[in-house]
Amino acid sequence: MRPVFQWNLGTRTLELGKRTLIMGIVNVTPDSFSDGGQFLDRDQAIAQAERLLDEGADIVDIGGESTRPGARVNPGAAKSAESRKTSDANSKSAIAASAVNAAAVSAAVSAEEELRRVLPVIAELKRKHPAAVLSVDTYKADVARAAVGAGAEIVNDVSGFRWDPRMTKTVAELKCGAVLMHMRGRPEEWRTLPPPGDIVLLVKRELKEWAETAVLAGVRRERIVLDPGFGFGKSFDENYPLLARFSELQTTGFPLLAGTSRKSFIGRTLASNGKDAPPEGRLYGTLASQTALILKGAHIVRTHDVKAAVEAARVADAILLAR
């Protein structure tokens, strides 16, 4: 039976385990693998979020930077504008170092740009739908703080609090909900990562370590949900064992989120005539994976296709209750 948790978001508590919660995805980005560019405009992003709420989303997750395979990520952008100005004023060498760093991460998204994308969407959604549970998908502490100030109640960090050294303290201070996701390496490194050995044991061990580190740093245990990060630094041959043995992650002692929506490993399984199924052709494969994950203990499913996921989750939940 799936364990029941009370997820403390600071402003309210969500019960996890009695039924599966559905987290709908809104990418305010030009380059996300599935829907990049579709919702970059503020009004389009808000309209999409409202559609997801109408379809039954329990949570809407809003992101302003893609972490698709091959994407450049910018942990350095997490440094606040004020602290950058201070360090730049201290010495010419700091200015030079900053210029070199900026050039190195020019393909990544700055905190300022990420905020420009997501903050108006979060603020307007909260104004129009004050009861909606909003999540911000970011690994930058400055973005997390501003987003929670605008109405987000959850910080969904794909790096598991590892890329921005201020993130753990920031989330502890904000007293919001948190999702710690597992990722091997950075997106630009994924194609060259060495084999992990037993991927399930690795993910379980590292997620547990990262969560316990966050607890020791002041993030209350009841605020944390763990995500094994399907597709994030995992090869085709590693995603299916992680799915098949998902129930083993329950030994971490934390509630679990699963995100397989439209992922490339599903597209490859559904390949036809030597070509992977495109993201828009992966719905039924996604639903099969989501149903299996719910039956193996997932508390939250993160998805682009909310209505379909809601219906699949109802059936999977009924099966769990019948055991």
Regions inferred by a protein language model and the residue ranges of each:
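N-terminal amphipathic alpha-helix/helix-capping segment at the start of soluble metabolic enzymes
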Residues: 1-27, 212-215, 219, 272, ...
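Short, low-complexity, charge-dense intrinsically disordered segments
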Residues: 76-91, 96-99
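Active-site-adjacent loop and "lid" segments of alpha/beta metabolic enzymes
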Residues: 9, 34-51, 67-79, 105-128, ...
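N-terminal glycine-rich anion-binding loops that anchor highly charged ligand groups
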Residues: 16-24, 51-64
